[in-house]
């Protein structure tokens, strides 16, 4: 900082005259008169002593009105205010640069003059600035006179202490005007602003890559490795550069080097290190200054001075040859032997371990300590030092000599070999052979002693060590979350502010973090700069590459503490731990289901929409997951079928049509039925098994099972694992009670025509439609004793108005109004229905109903015309067609007899569905979709049975459809059924003693084949199968 510079005389520890350094070293000053009582430092003037004492007291009485900064002296405040106003009154006569202080101009002039007036008496290093000279002296003495009042740390200068105090105070006075990010130093703010401006001033001389920071460029240089070609010759003494200062020079001033010449052997260690000076003719050289203590780069000396870095004086050097006429230092430095080729390193003498950087050696040697007086010995000469800092300062002379003879990409890094034994200076070493071609590998010289992880920079290792110690010094003031880096805290705070400062110029997306913004830009450009060295696969960022490398290394460093399972990424471990904790944080907004992974939620949401991205190439059916598609494709593979009478019997003569239906598609597949609360046993069989007539062969045959699973009742192939569909809403209930009494099963075929109601068997079931006409169907108690135990399929509804019954030709049904409820009541008290397993259905017949129906008040109701489709066993010879005990005249309905019943799976407008096929005598078929299977309500008791058990019950109804005709548009002709929404609640008329079913349903008749001007329905009709046997199996072959 500006207020922290104190011009000190280089020859003593007393305060200098205050004059700016001239071209030569200042002369010795008279003895000091004023001494500091805290540290013993002496000053010539009391004002200097007073200014110095504020260093110990921390007093800063001069505060800036524009920012929170305060200073110990008024002159420092004056210079600081020029930073706000932009005033720079002191301009360099050799270049266009201007400065706000005359001392800064004098310091800058040393770049052109090359003067280094301050020379260390212990190691010979020379400095341009007295503040850096004083800082360097403390490296020899180990003095750290500026302790932190909040922690045990101490620092060599006040600026380092001020920067450290920001860790405790959290002060960040410099704020970015674009994204609001704040910084402790103005130089950091300027560097950050390059993220928004896109400025990347540091270009690699070996590849087209550019960087925003010089330190990033230096790290990038390591990936190129040693440059090919012969090693350059060591520079003359006047060209020796300080290698601990990392400085880059623009490409325009990089000159080719001359062939190497063997230097003369050095007689003894050098006492003085001459410095590199730049001639005034090269005033346009753009130098980039880098702080050696914290590896931060700067574009000018002024910024570097404001930064006031940690260890290491910032000296600008060049990587190219310097003209011979440059001024030299007072004494020449004999050159050591050239460094041997190979990777340079620093060697620890006590244990022989080598390090690539001085910092690595410094950290390592702290483990040995300084037990003896001369514990730290130089590996290149016989010098020994009591402190590590003194040894490091001494080794700079060897570093400079080696750096002068290295290629430009490596010249800025202080890495040389300090051998255990001195090199014999007998004969000059021959020129080394050309080094191998550069190896592109990310060098990571900073290794963690705890886990072995390596890093490119010391800052990365420092942050990593906090993972082991648990230190998180940066805490969010909003939520209390703590972080190990201040930059991570600033990124986190955008969660509270919502600031998204990075906007894509191509698509307009905004981002909170620059890393996500850079990654997004590569989506547009297609750039994948990070390639795997094992397989060549490229990635958009380094984190993706690191995760990919686990595939080759097999590393799985993150283990579950509960079950021991290991993972390559922490995110996978967190997801796995939800298995143990039961956490399911992702909830579907349309249903109550929750999931452990967001991807599973996305897949689930497809079940609520029409999205089916995985389509079957054979039948076109879509699936929400690829796994479901693979499972479905197995159904197209030919499989062994189960032979038997079930589903295999086909009528020998083509039966008459029962009802026309839309022509089904040829594709077949499994249709999963909706949920069911009980187990079902149902076998569907045709008549007597007969040979299949010749015809086109089916594409494949498969045996299917209707089984009760944890997800509901499902119809699946016997060799395929059933999928797990989402449970649909519970279907509406329709109650159908079969007959209670039974007669012995006979073997005679059913009569083709109906008999009168009076001749029907006893114990028939009851169908009740409490609609407008109060229609009911009830078997008489004193009916004839010829067969019994019939089962009913309800096909028709009440007629409209006073219209009488109509004859049924094929199946021609009267236009329907609506049926409110369907109820079944036994002739006597029936509480339980027991069904006999596996009996064949031989005849299905459709007949009209005539006669009057009594309502609940005993009066005669309107004449209705229901059509009842009866499925009966072979033993039954009489068909029940009327609701009452009265006699009804015979009517011929032979065309309605169904000769065969079988199942198949067809493609409909609503997808693949299981279809009941009813074959008529004329060869035409009617297909009815199996929509649902239900059981009767429990709690019913069965009366004593005097005959065989009742047969299976089938209720035929249609599936929901969207394109249905209104009742007014229904014309005459063949009709099918449609189940509508429940009717409005209200009183329902019913005969005396007949219970009313709570869920009332509506039935509508629509034409199956469109007439002129009438649109045909888009869906097949459906059947509802009701069964109560507890055994579990529905097997049908098709």
UniProtKB/Swiss-Prot annotation:
<keyword id="KW-0677">Repeat</keyword>
<feature type="zinc finger region" description="C2H2-type 11">
    <location>
        <begin position="474"/>
        <end position="496"/>
    </location>
</feature>
<dbReference type="GO" id="GO:0008270">
    <property type="term" value="F:zinc ion binding"/>
</dbReference>
<feature type="modified residue" description="Phosphothreonine">
    <location>
        <position position="197"/>
    </location>
</feature>
<feature type="zinc finger region" description="C2H2-type 9">
    <location>
        <begin position="376"/>
        <end position="398"/>
    </location>
</feature>
<keyword id="KW-0805">Transcription regulation</keyword>
<feature type="repeat" description="2">
    <location>
        <begin position="822"/>
        <end position="832"/>
    </location>
</feature>
<keyword id="KW-0597">Phosphoprotein</keyword>
<feature type="compositionally biased region" description="Pro residues">
    <location>
        <begin position="723"/>
        <end position="733"/>
    </location>
</feature>
<feature type="zinc finger region" description="C2H2-type 1">
    <location>
        <begin position="34"/>
        <end position="56"/>
    </location>
</feature>
<feature type="region of interest" description="Disordered">
    <location>
        <begin position="220"/>
        <end position="242"/>
    </location>
</feature>
<feature type="region of interest" description="Disordered">
    <location>
        <begin position="637"/>
        <end position="661"/>
    </location>
</feature>
<dbReference type="GO" id="GO:0006355">
    <property type="term" value="P:regulation of DNA-templated transcription"/>
</dbReference>
<feature type="zinc finger region" description="C2H2-type 5">
    <location>
        <begin position="146"/>
        <end position="168"/>
    </location>
</feature>
<feature type="region of interest" description="Disordered">
    <location>
        <begin position="717"/>
        <end position="763"/>
    </location>
</feature>
<feature type="region of interest" description="Disordered">
    <location>
        <begin position="254"/>
        <end position="273"/>
    </location>
</feature>
<feature type="region of interest" description="Disordered">
    <location>
        <begin position="1"/>
        <end position="31"/>
    </location>
</feature>
<feature type="repeat" description="4">
    <location>
        <begin position="844"/>
        <end position="854"/>
    </location>
</feature>
<feature type="zinc finger region" description="C2H2-type 13">
    <location>
        <begin position="530"/>
        <end position="552"/>
    </location>
</feature>
<feature type="region of interest" description="4 X 11 AA tandem repeats of VQLQP-[AL]-[QT]-[EG]-[VQ]-[ATV]-[ST]">
    <location>
        <begin position="811"/>
        <end position="854"/>
    </location>
</feature>
<protein>
    <recommendedName>
        <fullName>Zinc finger protein 628</fullName>
    </recommendedName>
</protein>
<comment type="subunit">
    <text>Interacts with TAF4B.</text>
</comment>
<feature type="zinc finger region" description="C2H2-type 12">
    <location>
        <begin position="502"/>
        <end position="524"/>
    </location>
</feature>
<feature type="modified residue" description="Phosphothreonine">
    <location>
        <position position="581"/>
    </location>
</feature>
<feature type="zinc finger region" description="C2H2-type 7">
    <location>
        <begin position="202"/>
        <end position="224"/>
    </location>
</feature>
<feature type="zinc finger region" description="C2H2-type 14">
    <location>
        <begin position="558"/>
        <end position="580"/>
    </location>
</feature>
<keyword id="KW-0238">DNA-binding</keyword>
<dbReference type="InterPro" id="IPR036236">
    <property type="entry name" value="Znf_C2H2_sf"/>
</dbReference>
<feature type="zinc finger region" description="C2H2-type 3">
    <location>
        <begin position="90"/>
        <end position="112"/>
    </location>
</feature>
<dbReference type="GO" id="GO:0007283">
    <property type="term" value="P:spermatogenesis"/>
</dbReference>
<feature type="zinc finger region" description="C2H2-type 2">
    <location>
        <begin position="62"/>
        <end position="84"/>
    </location>
</feature>
<feature type="compositionally biased region" description="Low complexity">
    <location>
        <begin position="734"/>
        <end position="756"/>
    </location>
</feature>
<keyword id="KW-0539">Nucleus</keyword>
<dbReference type="GO" id="GO:0003677">
    <property type="term" value="F:DNA binding"/>
</dbReference>
<dbReference type="Pfam" id="PF00096">
    <property type="entry name" value="zf-C2H2"/>
</dbReference>
<keyword id="KW-0863">Zinc-finger</keyword>
<dbReference type="InterPro" id="IPR050758">
    <property type="entry name" value="Znf_C2H2-type"/>
</dbReference>
<feature type="zinc finger region" description="C2H2-type 8">
    <location>
        <begin position="346"/>
        <end position="368"/>
    </location>
</feature>
<keyword id="KW-0862">Zinc</keyword>
<comment type="function">
    <text>Transcriptional activator. Binds DNA on GT-box consensus sequence 5'-TTGGTT-3'. Plays a role in spermiogenesis.</text>
</comment>
<feature type="compositionally biased region" description="Pro residues">
    <location>
        <begin position="227"/>
        <end position="237"/>
    </location>
</feature>
<dbReference type="InterPro" id="IPR013087">
    <property type="entry name" value="Znf_C2H2_type"/>
</dbReference>
């Amino acid at each position: 900082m500006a207020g922290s510079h104190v011009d000190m005389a280089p020859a003593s520890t007393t305060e200098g005259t205050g004059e700016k350094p001239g071209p030569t070293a200042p002369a010795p000053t008279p003895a000091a008169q004023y001494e500091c009582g805290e540290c013993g430092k002496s000053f010539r003037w009391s004002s200097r002593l007073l200014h110095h004492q504020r260093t110990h007291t921390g007093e800063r009485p001069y505060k800036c009105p524009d920012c929170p900064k305060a200073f110990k002296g008024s002159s420092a405040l004056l210079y600081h205010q020029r930073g706000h106003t932009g005033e720079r009154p002191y301009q360099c006569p050799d270049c266009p640069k201007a400065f706000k202080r005359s001392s800064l101009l004098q310091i800058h002039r040393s770049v052109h003059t090359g003067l280094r007036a301050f020379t260390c008496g212990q190691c010979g290093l020379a400095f341009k600035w007295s503040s850096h000279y004083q800082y360097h002296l403390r490296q020899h003495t180990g003095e750290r006179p500026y302790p932190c009042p909040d922690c045990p740390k101490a620092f060599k200068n006040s600026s380092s202490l001020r920067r450290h105090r920001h860790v405790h105070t959290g002060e960040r006075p410099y704020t970015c005007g674009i994204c609001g990010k704040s910084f402790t130093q103005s130089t950091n703010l300027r560097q950050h602003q390059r993220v928004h401006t896109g400025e990347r001033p540091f270009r690699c001389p070996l590849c087209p890559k550019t960087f925003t920071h010089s330190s990033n460029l230096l790290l990038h240089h390591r990936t190129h490795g040693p440059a090919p070609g012969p090693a350059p010759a060591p520079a003359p003494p006047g060209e020796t550069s300080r290698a601990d200062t990392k400085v880059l020079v623009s490409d325009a001033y990089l000159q080719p080097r001359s062939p190497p010449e063997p230097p003369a052997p050095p007689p003894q260690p050098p006492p003085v290190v001459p410095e590199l000076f730049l001639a005034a003719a090269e005033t346009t050289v753009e130098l980039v200054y880098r702080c050696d203590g914290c590896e931060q780069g700067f574009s000018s000396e002024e910024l570097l001075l404001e930064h006031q870095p940690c260890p290491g004086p910032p000296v600008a050097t060049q990587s190219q040859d310097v003209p011979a006429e440059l001024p030299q230092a007072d004494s020449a430095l004999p050159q050591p032997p050239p460094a041997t080729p190979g990777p340079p390193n620093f060697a620890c003498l006590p244990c022989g371990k080598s390090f690539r950087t001085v910092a690595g050696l410094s950290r390592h040697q702290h483990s040995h300590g300084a037990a003896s007086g001369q514990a730290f010995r130089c590996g290149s000469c016989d010098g020994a030092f009591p402190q590590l800092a003194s040894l490091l300062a001494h080794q700079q002379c060897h570093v400079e000599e080696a750096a002068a003879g290295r290629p430009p990409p490596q010249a800025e890094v202080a890495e040389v070999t300090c051998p255990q034994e001195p090199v014999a200076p007998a004969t000059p070493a021959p020129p080394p052979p050309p080094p191998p071609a550069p190896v592109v590998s990310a060098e990571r010289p900073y290794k963690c002693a705890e886990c072995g992880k390596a890093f490119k920079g010391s800052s990365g290792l420092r942050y990593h060590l906090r993972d082991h110690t648990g230190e998180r010094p940066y805490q969010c003031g909003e939520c209390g979350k703590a972080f190990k880096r201040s930059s991570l805290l600033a990124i986190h705070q955008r969660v509270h502010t919502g600031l998204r400062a990075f906007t894509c110029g191509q698509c307009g997306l905004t981002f909170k973090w620059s890393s996500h913004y850079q990654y997004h830009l590569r989506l547009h450009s297609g750039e994948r700069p990070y390639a795997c060295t094992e397989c060549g696969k490229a990635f958009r960022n380094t984190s993706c590459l690191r995760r990919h490398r686990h595939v080759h290394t097999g590393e799985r460093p993150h283990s579950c503490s509960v079950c021991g399972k290991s993972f390559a990424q922490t995110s996978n471990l967190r997801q796995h731990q939800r298995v143990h904790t039961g956490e399911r944080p992702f909830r579907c907004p349309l249903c109550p289901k929750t999931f452990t992974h967001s991807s599973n939620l996305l897949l689930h949401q497809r079940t609520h929409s029409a999205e089916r991205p995985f389509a079957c190439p054979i039948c076109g059916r879509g699936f929400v997951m690829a796994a479901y598609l693979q499972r479905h494709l197995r159904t197209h593979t030919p499989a062994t079928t189960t032979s038997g009478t079930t589903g295999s019997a086909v009528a020998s003569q083509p039966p008459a049509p029962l009802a026309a239906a839309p022509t089904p598609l040829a594709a077949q597949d499994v249709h999963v039925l909706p949920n069911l609360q009980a187990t079902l046993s149902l076998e569907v069989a045709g008549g007597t098994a007969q040979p299949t007539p010749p015809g086109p062969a089916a594409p494949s045959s498969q045996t299917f099972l209707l089984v009760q699973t944890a997800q509901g009742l499902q119809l699946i192939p016997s060799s395929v694992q059933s999928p797990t569909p989402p449970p649909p809403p519970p279907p509406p209930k329709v109650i159908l009670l079969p007959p209670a009494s039974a007669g012995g099963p006979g073997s005679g075929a059913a009569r083709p025509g109906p008999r009168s109601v009076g001749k029907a068997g006893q114990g028939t079931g009851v169908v009740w439609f409490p609609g407008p006409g109060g229609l009911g169907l009830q078997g008489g108690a004193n009916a004839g004793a010829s067969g019994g135990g019939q089962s009913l399929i309800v096909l028709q509804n009440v007629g409209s108005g006073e219209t009488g019954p109509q004859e049924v030709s094929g199946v021609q049904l009267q236009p329907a109004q609506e049926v409110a409820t369907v109820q079944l009541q036994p002739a006597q008290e029936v509480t339980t229905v027991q069904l006999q397993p596996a009996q064949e259905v031989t005849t299905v017949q459709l007949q009209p109903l005539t006669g009057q129906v009594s309502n609940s008040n005993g009066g005669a109701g309107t004449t209705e015309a229901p059509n009842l489709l009866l499925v009966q066993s072979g033993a039954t010879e009489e068909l029940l067609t009327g609701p009452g005990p009265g006699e009804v005249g015979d009517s011929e309905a032979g065309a309605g007899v169904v000769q065969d019943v079988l199942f198949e799976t067809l493609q409909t407008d609503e997808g693949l569905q299981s279809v009941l096929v009813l074959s008529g005598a004329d060869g035409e078929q009617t297909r009815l979709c199996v929509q649902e299977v239900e059981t009767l309500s429990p709690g019913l008791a069965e009366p004593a049975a005097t005959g065989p058990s009742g047969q299976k019950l089938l209720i035929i109804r249609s599936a929901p459809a969207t394109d249905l005709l209104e009742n007014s548009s229904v014309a005459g002709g063949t009709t099918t059924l449609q189940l509508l929404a429940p009717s409005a609640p209200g009183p329902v008329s019913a005969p005396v003693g007949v219970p009313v079913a709570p869920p009332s349903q509506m039935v509508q008749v629509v034409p199956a084949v469109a007439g002129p001007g009438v649109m045909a329905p888009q869906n097949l009709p459906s059947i509802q199968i009701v069964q109560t046997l507890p055994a579990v199996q529905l097997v049908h072959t098709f």
